[in-house]
Amino acid sequence: MFYNNISVMIYKFFQVLLKISVRIYFKNKVIAGKNNIPKGKPVMFVANHPGAFMDPIVISSFCDRSLHYIARGESFKNRFAKWFFKKLHMIPVYRKEQTPELIHKNEAIFDACFKHFENGKSLIIFPEGTSKIEYRLRKVKSGAARIALGSEAENNFSLGLSIVPVGLTYSNPKNFRTDIQVNF
């Protein structure tokens, strides 16, 4: 019980801290389509990935719900990072190009994502798989589709999972006091 309360407190603390940081970091913020986010049901947010670590922070800052994040498995290498990232609701996924010896863990990770959706939780995934500052959508990987379809299949296609596309456009994500546009 105490452990769960600490986990919630850590997540909430960083959620508030990062919301404030995003509002300071970006000068002009245009947020559109928040009304497209359904309430009271599981949602998979599927976003482009132009700003690396900034992207999940930005989406979380303008979304009024607790979110879980699919993240690069290589980031979970040491014990502290693994502990800390889990407190921030990050879920590792392994890529055959970087960690072929760990790719087998993805089945259990996908099952965990299915359970999140069954419990009404929401998830952010970046199907491009990598981040690069470009003003175009790059080739997408199959993970988002596999997780969405797998979640529904596990629930006889009655889960009601909503997929909300998210478009992120930065004037320059690396520079302070630049502009951001988020379209839900």
Feature map (PLM): residue ranges:
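Short, positively charged and aromatic/hydrophobic N-terminal segments
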Residues: 1-5
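Soluble catalytic domains of membrane acyltransferases
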Residues: 6-184
